Amino acid sequence: MTGTETEDDIPLGERKTVTDFCYLLDKSKQLFNGLRDLPQYGHKQWQSYFGRTFDVYTKLWKFQQQHRQILDSRYGLKRWQIGEVASKIGQLYYHYYLRTSETSYLNEAFSFYSAIRQRSYYFQVNKEDRPELVVKKLRYYARYIVVCLLLNKMDLVKVLVKELSEEIEDYTQRFNTEDQLEWNLVLQEVAAFVEADPVVVLNDNNSVVVFSNRMLEGSTPPLEQGMVKFSELTIDMFRMLQALEREPVNLATQTFKQGTLEPNEKPAKRENPHKYLLYKPTFSQLFTFLSASFKELPANSVLLVYLSATGIFPTGHSDYEGPYDFGGVLTNTNRDVVNGETMQKRNQLQKEMHCLHPGDLFPFTRKPLFVIVDSSNSTAYKNFTNLFGQPLVCLLSPMVYPKSVQDQSQRGSLFTLFLYSPLLAFSSMCGLSSVRRGLWDRAQEFLCKVYRDIGQMISRSRTIDQAFLQFFGDEFLRLLLVRFVFCSAALRLHKLFRESRSFPESYPELPKQDTVESSLLQKHVLELAAMLDVQGALDSPPTLDFQWRDLRSTYPRTPHPFLLLNVRSSQQAKVCLAQITRTRVSTLTR
């Protein structure tokens, strides 16, 4: 209403339009707020609720588009309110992606967040004397940045970080708030993500090239014939998240209709493992999610557990060494108070309450289980007993790293980096800080050949445990196994990796002569080093007839700067549970 106009002066149809809009707006807020109370596990418990929420927001969005003029004049609809609705829809798609692992929903979230910025929905917020509205804008920027990071839109991330920095500076100058340090921390966390890769790839004009490390079609070695923390998102979790996803279809080329927030066509369905991401969980939280994942696991599927945390070592000696006597990984720190009471100092024979011991995973070996442990006590998980005869494999990180090539926790774990991008990890381990685009492409092409050879080594070995072959039929697990073997071979040839504790291990143990110490694989690693001109970082085994001189003409020298990694600090517990299955998740209709 405007001026002296009363409600009775408004035509009945327009009054009904405002009433219907208010109803949809209230209903959408009610449903959206209810999402936080839903458990993250159990499809049946949350999928229908998400469907209802999507439906109401779709109606609300279309309704405000169709009746914008009436809502502007009669309701006083402001552009930031439209932006808030669009932001909520973006959040819906992002959280649906987290629950389903369907990367196409990231594109949907990006389309809404992008349109908010393009149409300056939050532009007028800075002119309002209401700090809570500015906070809405800052939170929008933070969410938009997370989505862009997951889509590897690094150039846009840098622009958004600059804009967010300016917005935070303006916000803290205008309002005397207590959350200034919190927002500055957000900026620092984003900057750490942007600078996390220890090696950059450069074009001819010295501009940085950004690559996605999600699985591409044809990027996994073929099977042989007849074979069956930004926003609590740490860099290691970010890398494993992408290692367990396929590249979204038409990610770079998808266009959007003019004047609408809807894409031209619905995103194509892709098969990705359903994942749960846990940051510093308590043992009870971790066990709850493990149990839910185990219960939901379809037939012919496997549960993957990725653990990245500080190692907990046994405090005393026991005559009987069982599955709880080798320590494990610490799931949560600073847990000195239990049920309101301060914990007394533990007896040496007592176990750490918030340690995940190998024995804690025994109940879940009733179904196929694939475990990755990145920790200073990873080898505790070699002490498994396959009680139920189901396929079981554990890939275990080095326990220690050489002092001069230490794993820098701020930039993530070297072991996880190998599972995410072997070429990035290899280049970093050998001291490279930058690589030219042409050389990078040739090295990646060479690695594809290496992966095929590793795949043949595994599938043709007569002494390998059958568990590896049973998991080798899945594309994601096959790629992880191949990268693990390459990592093990590369570390064994590096001059500074000399302790046995500095090498990755596995349960069951891989036949070394057929895989990680194969002369063919060793030759491939040395060839890659020659290609990158980092021969000085590796040693040729005395048993291998290999001449560096033969390769120098094949791979000419390329000048490059060097970078050594800094000291690693203690890890904070990160857990990723993934259900590797070919079962599709039904698509929500918009």
Feature-to-residue mapping (PLM):
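Flexible helix-coil transition and linker loops at the boundaries of alpha-helical arrays
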Residues: 60-80, 119-132
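N-terminal alpha-helical scaffolding segments that mark the starts
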Residues: 1-69
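C-terminal functional modules of predominantly eukaryotic multidomain proteins
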Residues: 245, 343, 439-588
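A domain-level signal for caspase-like cysteine endopeptidase catalytic cores
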Residues: 206-353, 372-375
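Active-site-proximal C-terminal subdomain of hydrolase catalytic domains
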Residues: 370, 374-493
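Cytosolic small-GTPase signaling regions in large eukaryotic proteins
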Residues: 108-225, 385, 441, 449-493, ...
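Short coil/turn connectors between adjacent alpha-helices in alpha-solenoid helical repeat scaffolds
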Residues: 35-53, 94-109, 150-157, 419
